UniProtKB/Swiss-Prot annotation:
Entry GO MF terms: GTP binding; GTPase activity; guanosine tetraphosphate binding; ribosome binding; translation elongation factor activity
Main subcellular location of this protein, as a coarse class: membrane
Cellular compartment(s): Cell inner membrane
Signal peptide range: none
Protein name: Elongation factor 4
Enzyme Commission number: 3.6.5.n1
Family stated for the protein in its record: Belongs to the TRAFAC class translation factor GTPase superfamily. Classic translation factor GTPase family. LepA subfamily.
Mode of membrane association: Peripheral membrane protein
Length: 595
């Protein structure tokens, strides 16, 4: 057991952790030359296209060190994007150490700082590695200083390497074997294993990735899932290297998969403890905190026949992604669907794309909202995540919106633009630290403003150099109103928004203008209005298409022309009373893209 090392890699987006993982796999002979491809571990098509890691993946490699001992390296790849921090905390719970990979040209970024603190809090040994040393703009001394100043770990002897060219990678492995502690645990004790991840396979049922703390598990054992109390027979155990490879057993300290023919999707929840049926009173391992969704949006199938398939697809996805939550809801405009909770906008986009790709569904998404806290005049407090569920304003004593504490790391030359952006988003500055060439500013921002387009705007005002990390802080009273959209004097519930009163007029005007471009012209005028309560704050009209009824009158009396025009007018009026307007999918998304 002293020859096992469990570790994961912490890095910001695009600092090269998936490429470094490829090098490890290549050096330890996990795959033949023919099977080797870039970013082996990013197995989802979506991950390859966007060039980001979404799910945590695990690999077991055997590395023969210079001292002649062969070490078993269990390596768990983690995502770097702020929306997927919970995936990172799960991976870290299964490790004894972490590699902090920093791009030697760009330096430390906010996301790696946040993940690094998580690792240190969980008592992991953090080992800094400078990547991309082959680039001309690499400046190792500045970056080492940044690591020490911002994160506060000693980086004087950080290993320098380049994952792309393969330079220094063996040095990284040698250092890893030396600095990261071996797992503790006892093979003779009763089985205790932590579920790091699970996913649903149509043939095998639930496949769980586990880290064994104590004891051992082999094929034919009866295992007990602590939270459900159900017993299952183990069909097979094994490791990924990176292909599925069955082994005789999994022993204390190892990371691998267990297949036990669990057909119920919620049969092996992530973060749960497994043990043998003979020792049911083993302590539950400390899991990791369930992260609450920050953003809610309605998802509706375009055709109502897909509703059942949609429900099934959501169930399978929740198994694999424990942070996704959903409840059924119905809308007058869109029919039946689900109200889903996500961690952020990227998470929402990715879930929607996975549903459309992997399960062939056509979906309509409504505008995302956050949870508001309302104090009613009766004295009770309620939480609302859907603008159409907002009670009557006369019954509300106080409305509070969620505030996030955002930490932004930005080079000094872009600081001014970032501050302007934060003020525009109603932010309040908390503090500012100058660290070498970078500045760390922290702001209290309304989550409503952060959720929609803050990340994209931040990247564009800082030319891509600023990085962001945020977490929920508190609820705070705010002057909020509900903005309704009326089309031909009928409210469309799926387009309602909750906005700050100061921005309401501007938002209403922008929204009606945008709708005007997207709603196709009909045979009658379509009035688009934005209203706060009973007061209309903005209006535009989509003009009717009309036939030239005077084409057949050459000259002739004016009363003849008037008769034809009056007749057309009466027809249009009648049409407007019975006609209904089809609202295209783009119109629902327009709410997101209000500049």
């Amino acid at each position: 057991m002293s020859h096992i090392r469990n570790f994961s890699i912490i890095a910001h987006i695009d600092h090269g952790k998936s490429t470094l993982a490829d090098r490890f796999i290549q050096m330890c002979g996990g795959l033949s030359e023919r099977e080797m491809e870039a970013q082996v571990l990013d197995s989802m098509d979506l991950e390859r296209e966007r060039g980001i890691t979404i799910k945590a993946h695990s690999v077991t490699l055997y590395y023969k060190a210079k001292d002649g001992i062969t070490y078993q390296l269990n390596f768990i790849d983690t995502p770097g994007h702020v929306d997927f921090t919970y995936e990172v905390s799960r991976s870290l719970a299964a490790c004894e150490g972490a590699l902090l990979v920093v791009d030697a040209g760009q330096g430390v970024e906010a996301q790696s700082v946040a993940n690094c603190y998580t690792a240190i809090e969980q008592g992991l040994e953090v080992m800094p590695v400078l990547n991309k040393m082959d680039l001309p703009q690499a400046d190792p001394d500045r970056v080492k200083e940044e690591i020490e100043k911002i994160i506060g770990i000693d980086a004087t002897d950080a290993v320098a390497c380049s994952a792309k060219s393969g330079m220094g990678v063996d040095e990284v492995l040698e250092r890893l074997v030396a600095t990261i502690p071996a797992p503790t645990g006892n093979i003779e004790d009763p089985l205790q294993a932590l579920i790091i991840d699970s996913w649903f396979d149509n043939y095998l049922g639930v496949v769980s990735l586990v880290r064994v703390r104590h004891g051992r598990v082999k094929k034919g054992d009866k295992i007990l899932v602590k939270s459900t109390g159900k017993l299952h027979l183990v069909d097979s155990v094994g490791v990924f290297n990176p292909k599925h490879t069955a082994t005789v057993d999994l022993k204390a300290g190892e990371v691998g998969f267990i297949i036990a023919g669990i057909k119920d999707i919620h049969g092996a929840p992530v973060g749960d403890t497994l043990t043998l049926s003979t020792t049911p009173d083993v302590d539950v391992l400390p899991g990791f905190k369930r992260i609450q969704p920050q953003v809610y949006a309605g998802l509706f199938p375009v055709s109502s026949d897909d509703f059942e398939d949609f429900r099934e697809a959501l169930q399978k996805l929740t198994l694999n992604d424990s942070s996704l939550q959903y409840l059924p809801e119905s809308s007058d405009a869109l029919g039946f669907g689900f109200r889903c909770g996500f961690l952020g906008m990227l998470h929402m986009e990715i879930i929607q794309e996975r549903l459309e790709r992997e399960y062939n569904l056509d979906l309509i998404t409504t505008a995302p909202t956050v949870i508001f806290e309302l104090l009613l005049k009766t004295g009770e407090t309620i939480y609302v995540d859907n603008p159409s569920k907002l009670p009557d304003l006369s019954s509300i004593e106080d409305m509070r919106e969620p505030i996030v504490r955002a930490n932004i790391l930005v080079p000094q030359e872009h600081l001014g633009n970032v501050i302007t952006l934060c003020i525009e988003k109603r932010g309040v500055q908390h503090d500012m630290l100058f660290l070498g060439t970078q500045v760390q500013v922290s702001y209290d921002l309304p989550m409503n403003e952060v959720v929609l387009d803050f990340f994209d705007r931040l990247k564009s005002v800082s030319r891509g150099y600023a990085s962001l990390d945020y977490h929920f802080d508190r609820y705070q009273s705010a002057n909020l109103v509900k903005l309704d959209v009326l089309i031909n004097a009928e409210k469309v519930d799926a387009l309602a928004l909750i906005v700050h009163r100061d921005n309401a007029h501007y938002k209403g005007r922008a929204l009606t203008e945008k709708m005007k471009e997207l709603i196709p012209r009909q045979m009658f005028d379509v009035a688009i209005q934005a209203a706060i309560g009973g007061q209309i704050v903005a209006r535009t009209t989509v003009k009717a298409l009309r036939k030239n009824v005077l084409a057949k009158c050459y000259g002739g009396d004016v009363s003849r022309k008037r008769k034809l025009l009056e007749k057309q007018k009466a027809g249009k009026k009648r049409m407007k009373q019975v006609g209904n307007v089809e609202i295209p999918q783009e119109a629902f998304l327009a709410v997101l893209r209000l500049e």
